Swiss-Prot record:
SUPFAM superfamilies in the cross-refs: Ribosomal protein S10 (SSF54999)
Highest rank taxon of the organism: Eukaryota
Name of the coding gene: RPS10
Subunit structure: Part of the 30S ribosomal subunit.
Record: transit peptide: 1-56
Name of the protein described by the UniProt record: Small ribosomal subunit protein uS10c
GO cellular component, one term: ribosome
Keyword Transit peptide on entry: yes
Keywords: Chloroplast, Plastid, Ribonucleoprotein, Ribosomal protein, Transit peptide
Organism: Arabidopsis thaliana
Length: 191
């Protein structure tokens, strides 16, 4: 726990002329910290001939107290404990599977088969995450020769899903290879 204190000091509110160095001498007085100031120490800078001053607040240098450093909870974690935490956060290896299909029931059935195969081998899965559907629109003239105002619009919608398999084993990869997915589903696998 860091302790911060704020000290305030008073500066003259006038410009100091550079022509007379003897008259620009400032008087500095330091007041000790007390309970009436709420733990604040103050420093007063005044010029003897002028009494106009401005107050500014400045943080003191933070010196940790010895009681804080002696506590066992304030130890710096070792590099081995940091690497163990990093291993828990991000897996070393994952399989990312992207599925594409023109028909939603086919892609949903394929996702279910992949998730069942991965979960049977005790691999952690994330997904299926629906990705944005891509629409390709084709504009075709209705008439064979003239009448350009009459047109057909055809579209092809490509539905996509993404599945991540974390911490895969050889058994997981083997069970994924044995799957018989429908021909209308495009499968892209990244290791």
């Amino acid at each position: 726990m860091a302790v911060s204190t704020v000290s305030s000091f008073l500066l003259p509110s006038f410009g100091i002329p550079s022509s007379s160095p003897s008259s620009t001498r400032l008087k500095v007085s330091l007041l000790p910290s007390s309970s009436t100031h709420g733990g604040l120490s103050s420093c007063v800078l005044t010029k003897p001939s002028v009494s106009l001053t401005k107050v500014f607040a400045v943080p003191d240098t933070l010196d940790p107290t010895p009681e804080i450093l002696d506590e066992p909870a304030s130890e710096v974690p070792s590099s081995s404990s940091i690497s163990v935490d990093a291993d828990k956060m991000a897996p070393k290896q994952k399989i990312r599977i992207k599925l594409r299909s023109y028909w939603v029931p086919l892609i949903e059935d394929s996702c279910k088969q992949i998730l069942d195969a991965a979960r049977n081998t005790n691999a952690k899965t994330m997904g299926p995450v629906p990705l944005p559907t891509k629409k390709r629109i084709y504009c075709v003239l209705k008439s064979p020769h003239v009448h350009k105002d009459a047109r057909f619009h055809f579209e092809i919608r490509t539905h996509q899903r993404m599945i991540d398999i974390l911490y895969p084993t050889a058994q997981t990869i083997d069970s994924l290879m044995q799957l018989d997915l429908p021909a209308g589903v495009d499968v892209e696998v990244k290791l």
